[in-house]
Amino acid sequence: MMAAVMNPSRQGSVIGTPKWRIPQWMLMPYLSVLGLVLPVLVYLLMMSHLGWRAPVFGDRAQSNAAAVAEGTVYLFVSETNKQYYDTIGGNYEVLVQPWRKYFKARGREYTEISDLDQVRPRANTVVILPSAIAIGADERRTLAGLQESGVSVLTTWASGTRNSDGEWTGWDFLQSLGIVVLGEREKLQGSERQITMSAETPLTLSQAPGQRVWLSPASEPMLRFRGDYIAARLTDWYRVETPGYPSEGAVVYTESRASRTVGFAFAETSWDASLNLIYPTLDDALLWLQRQPMIALANWPNGYHAAQLVEMDTEHLFGAANALADMLKARGIPGTFFLLTSEAIKDPKTVRRLANDRFDIAYHGDIHIGFAKQSEAEQQNRLTLMRQQLASLDPALARSARGFRAPTEAYEPITERLLQKMGIRYHLVDPSRTEAALPFFLKAKDVSPDDELVVMPRTQRDDLNQLSLTQDPQALLKALTDDMDNNRRDGGLGTLSVHSQNMSPGQPLNQAMAPYLDRLLQYQRSGDLWLASGEQVEQWWRARRNVAVVGSRQGLRLELDISVKGNAPVSGVTVLVMVPARGTVPTIRVTKVGAVQPVVKRVDDYTSQLVFPTLQPGNYAYQVNFSRRTK
């Protein structure tokens, strides 16, 4: 049964059926029992075949539930709302029941109340308003008083848009919570039920950056929110914001005086399609509302928030690769060139130049025909010929080339098995391979973790996509930059793929590329964006997997343990710290002899980084305190 009448200001609805997939990851907690008497939870190895990290926080298992501190979570289910939904032929239980299921699934205690006077304001208290459309004047005053005393609020959808008599009152109530409502979300080519997660915010520590989240069809139209901070953006499938509607959120958070607010722009009836993503977001949101410190291993090294790869599919008009190589070399930007070997053997001079300038040289197949729907034998023959052709130009280069990208992004599971067997270390794939903007490890039978293929999704529109929309160099530059900015905000791996046939002098891409690279360089110099080749991303992703971060909370102090396995040191390890109080900067004390002192960097009011120059294999221990505030 639907809740009915989801447009708070009028009857009816305009919601279509979304396209959605089941995300290709799952959390796997491992419980180790030591001895026959005392079971000890060692720490969580939360790894998916996508290879993205889930934060490890003390004894938190599959959720943040174990990390909840003192304080109470109240679920406000008022008679006023029940009566309002009854009058419009709806059923308020449909919106409340998902919360009860969430608390049961997470093993979290909560108190369901029908009157806000039942709230006992204590430290870390949270009131949840589950699509509470009808809120009376007395209830609004009571809630405002609770906020002044430090109670925080989590609200969903169109709470407070009507009074106790069911009369429309507008968006003023949500605005009083720090949420600006810009209206309803319009249909967007089938993506109106998709939101995109930003990484490394207090509300998304359990999410991969750029994670597409598909919401269930609902009679309640999604709203467009704006707040001080955005944890989930409104985008299309390519993670691009709607033109003319920048910086609009599906999940926002803010803080005003003593109270914090989290707002979800969609109703509870939308959750079912992605409970495995919604629940961790609720976990993190409640932790933030309860002012709990949190930690996580960052995705990228040296404090960078996001990464960017620029690569060329070097095929027809092979020599035009020199134009991109010139631009990259002049700026000191690494790049990857995927060589179509049947074309490469016709232009050995360009191949030698790319190799001599130490660009990442990788394979793009033998001929420009995809590998999909071909027999294993045919694929093997093609891969063998591909390597032989490059070896005819430079045997050492043919052996050292680590990456592969299938022509037309057409490949099959057998293709990747053959790549792994021949020693290829990474595969740059199509954007639909994963819903997240991160590399992942391809699990394969009888393949050791060290030899697993690193799969990297193309996360941005390529030059063919962009040139089909515009031939104007300035418009193209803006589109390329917008895609990069979106990924930079989300914190993922941005992958721009261009083609040699579009890089000749005078072509729009050639004209747009230099200023685009200048923008990339600007962000790298600011410490925000890591510019890396495919090989560098692959090597980092392998090194990062050898690092484990475990935290345990002692009041508002954290005990932090870091372990590095393997035989090689890891440089640039970055640990994210979500501080309990706005503007606090953590102080770090080494508690184990020989531990490396990190550099502490403030990111924003709620986030700091601990950046470790180099960590040798071994174990390290620290104490993290939160007594120092910024001025």
Place the predicted regions along the sequence by residue.
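Catalytic grooves of carbohydrate-active enzymes
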Residues: 307-316, 457-536
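Metal-dependent polysaccharide deacetylase catalytic core of the NodB/CE4 family, i.e.
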Residues: 161-163, 167-172, 185, 304-308, ...
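Extracellular ligand-binding/catalytic regions of CAZymes and related secreted enzymes
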Residues: 12-36, 40-72, 240-250, 256-311, ...
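Aromatic-Pro/Gly-enriched surface loop or interdomain linker
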Residues: 23-123, 270, 328, 337
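Catalytic beta-strand/loop cores that center a nucleophilic Ser/Cys/Thr
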Residues: 188-257
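A glycine-rich, often tryptophan-bearing local segment used as a flexible ligand/cofactor-contacting loop or short
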Residues: 134-204
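C-terminal beta-strand-rich structural cap/linker in extracellular carbohydrate-active enzymes
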Residues: 603-631
